Amino acid sequence: MSEKQFYLLQVNDALFPIGGYSHSQGLETYIQRGIVHNVDTAREYITHKIKWNLAYTELLAARLAYEAAEKKDLQELLYLEELLEASRIPMEQREAARKMGSRFAKTIEKLGLSIGETGIFREYLDARKGKAVNHCCIYGVFCAEMQIPMEEALTHYLYAQTSAIVTNCVKTIPLSQTSGQQLLSGCYGEFDEILKDVMNRSEEDLCLSAPGFDIRGIQHEKLYSRLYMS
């Protein structure tokens, strides 16, 4: 196993300090309204979330960012950032993506990797100086600059994000740890289809409408009590 593969594991680890644990991406609204309240409803929520929301937003954006970085196309990366800013409707989720992207960049720079000094990764960060970077975009650029195969990068990202959703369900509904592991492993059969679909999508499909998730994300802003920032 090469060093770059260990870095891939590291940036997708739940302990990587980008603050992802602080965000439920609207799940908290579903739980407070009693829509997601047990294992069965959690399974339905997670399946729909990864197939119709995560796939066409973060996962597709990571792929597009990877491809643009691979071509050293800085203008395409900057356009993708602006497109995501305009297309992601819930305010809290836009802010979450910015914060996690900023923390990702700062952590990578402190690791002392050579990619933090030259190349498209540095050009991209310099061009976005004073502006936000989306977590999924900077992740794609990082993986391209590290020459991590795109399929591996997207697979690890999909697993990590799904695991985070399951963890939020376990903590907030709440569910048992065993139920959480069963929910997570139950998603594996969907992963191959999701990844194939994302590889066949274009920029026009980015942030494909998922109104239910958007509405719950917006409603989260007005919840009386909250454990999560989004």
Regions picked out by a protein language model, each given a short descriptive name:
Residues 8-17, 46-52, 86-93, 122-129, ...:
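A short glycine/serine-rich beta->alpha loop
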Residues 4-72:
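Glycine/small-residue-rich interface belts in oligomeric ring/scaffold proteins
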Residues 59-64, 68-143:
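Internal, conserved structured core segments that host functional sites
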Residues 160-230:
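C-terminal auxiliary extensions adjacent to catalytic cores
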Residues 30-40, 111-118, 146-153, 172-179:
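Inter-helical turn/loop segments and adjacent helix faces that build the functional surface
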Residues 125-173:
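A contiguous pocket-lining binding segment that forms or flanks enzyme active sites
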Residues 17-18, 22, 54, 58-61, ...:
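Short, contiguous, pocket-lining structural segments
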